[in-house]
Structure formats: C-alpha cells, structure tokens
C-alpha cells in the first residue's frame, strides 16, 4: 500500500506539472511538444479520476461510520461505501499495475495472404473486415496506406494505419498488439466444387507507430526512394502522375510502399512513418528476444511465423492457441466482436507482467 501511495503522489505531481505546461501559451507554438504533453495528460487522467473518487468515498465512509454510532439508519450507507471503497482501491491498483509502454500508441498493421491462393486472399479480406468493424465500434480510425487485391476481391497484401480519435492510455496498440502471427482458416473454399474442407492462412504484422519519425534514427544514405504511378484494382491506373512511393531500407532490406495520397510528398511522409514503425519494432524485438532467453514465450509473441489462432468455419469455432481460448461464436467474432478474446489476452499479459515484476 505504501508503494501505491508513493506512486499516486508521483503521478499527482506529474499531472499538476502537465496542467501548468498546458496553460502556457508558448507550448502551443511547438506542435510536437503540445502533442506529447496532451497525450501524457490523457494517459494520467483515468488514474487521477479514480483517485479522486476513492478519496471522496473514503471521506464519506468515515462520516457515515461516525453517524452510524448515533443513528443505525446510516449503517447501511456505511456498508455500501465500504464496498465502493474496495472496488475503487482495486480499480486504482489495476491502473497502477505495470503496463506496456506502447499501449497508448497508434499502430501500423499489415495483413498478407499466405499459402492457399485465392482462398488465402479471401480469408485475409475477412480478417481486414473483422478488424475494421472492431475499430469502428471502439472509435478508432482506419486508414488504408497500400493494398493489392486478388482477382476475386480478396486481399493479397494490405497496410493499414489504425489510430485513436483522441489521445488515450488505451490506444490502438493496447487492443491489436496480440494479433501479430499466423492466422489459420478451415473451411470449404468458394473455389472448391467437391465441398472439401481446406486449410489456408494469412499473416498479420502489427507495429506501434512512433509519435514522430524523428524519434527513430533513419539515415538518408540508408534508404532508396522509388516513385511510380499508383494503380487501382487489376492494375488500372487511378493517377496520371508518379505519386506512389516505394522506400527500401538498404541495411535491413525492408520495403514500404504507399499510394493512398494523391501527392508524392504525402505518400513519402506516410511511407517514412511506416518504415520508422517497422524499424522501431525490429529493434525492440531484438532486445526482447535477448532478454527472454531461457524464459517462457510471452503472450505477444516475437515469432511472426507462429500459428496463433484458428478459425473453424464448419464448427463456428475460434481458437487462440497461446492461452487456450475457445469460443463457438466465429460469426460474431468476424463481425468485430473481439472484446472477450482481447480481454482474455490482456488479462494473460497482465498476469505475465506482474509475475515478471514479482
């Protein structure tokens, strides 16, 4: 409890300091600094609110107990407040628990069709729609940066940006970070005339997006920039200028493309953001792999080739192999109802973090 009090005191001090910064007109002359301060302020706000509610409930409980000595009618109120205080203490402890430092950040997501031809591309399209529906329900903004469709309207490869509408301690990363890995589907493909169940797969990559590209060191000498004419479905030209951008990071071989914007400058800026996210993730994953040597694999795996989940159409079942989660509501999940699964994954990660801290 003493450590919790100390943590709250530190947060209160930081919060008041942020309030003073936000009241300073000079801050708003620096957009990047204002964004950082506003984001941190939003991250601390839930802790401040719960702490205030807890202090108020504790004061009310003390008063109710005193009055209950003289008037037994206040005993019920005291008992209600005792329950409220315990609930708020648990909520505050949860908010103060160790967190992933990227949880408040936006993300870049890539979905790639795996083995299985058209069927794999159609499944990748199903995953795309599932994530889009979940994002819409939870107030995230989805932006397609680059995509390639299959002949039947599936997704061969797509790159997305998923962002919070407002700064929050529970950003897109806190929700989607567990999705990286191989997703497997079992169903009868639309191209199968004999009604046989087949297995196909799609790969999902997820990276936290840095607040500023400048926060990730990228030497201009290490990149090659190619421009080309953006195209739509089937290669049909949709832009008569060379506005699409392909950036190759020579030391790592990473390639990023963006053709969403009509301006080459805008596409280059977005491609650089995606490259920064991928390089940052690569660096952090290398460090995490070193730190995890000899330790059990984490819930959010660093192995992008690992099969993390199976979607079984005939049995309407979804299975997450990392935590043993199973549910027979595949239709709802594909409609964006991922809350139960994500909550289970978050709980497993939280338990893992607490164990590591202990």
Swiss-Prot record:
This is Peptide chain release factor 1. SMART domains: PCRF. GO terms for molecular function: translation release factor activity, codon specific. GO terms for cellular component: cytoplasm. SUPFAM superfamilies: Release factor. The modification N5-methylglutamine is found at residue 236. The keyword Cytoplasm applies.
